[in-house]
Amino acid sequence: FGHTFAHAIETVTDYQSYLHGEAVGIGMVMATDLSVRMNLCESDTADRVRRLIERYGLPVVAPKCSASLMLEAMAMDKKVIGGRMRFVLAKRIGEVSVESDVPQGKLDQTLAAGTNLSQG
């Protein structure tokens, strides 16, 4: 959960800008954002994840990342099967779903929000 985004963050920043745990925290925020956009979970769940990560002083956006470069890195992720990206997305706290049918527009919105280009 969060690692598809986290690995892209680490790749795009050449492992120099964020510690692994920081990248995973940002990835968790992005995964729950995408989950909400896909109507898999309630916005309260995403808010709760974000607040928890912020409470520990971890970043929740990756302004040092390019959304387009993240998308390229994600396309090379080991979880890509048959040319389709797979995401571990939240249904609620403690329950996830593996999704490969993610609309490009929703993913683009999540990447824009997660790289601080917009607030989604």
Give the residues covered by each predicted segment.
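Active-site segments that bind and position negatively charged phosphate/pyrophosphate groups
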Residues: 1-68
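C-terminal charged capping/lid subdomain of soluble metabolic enzymes
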Residues: 40-120
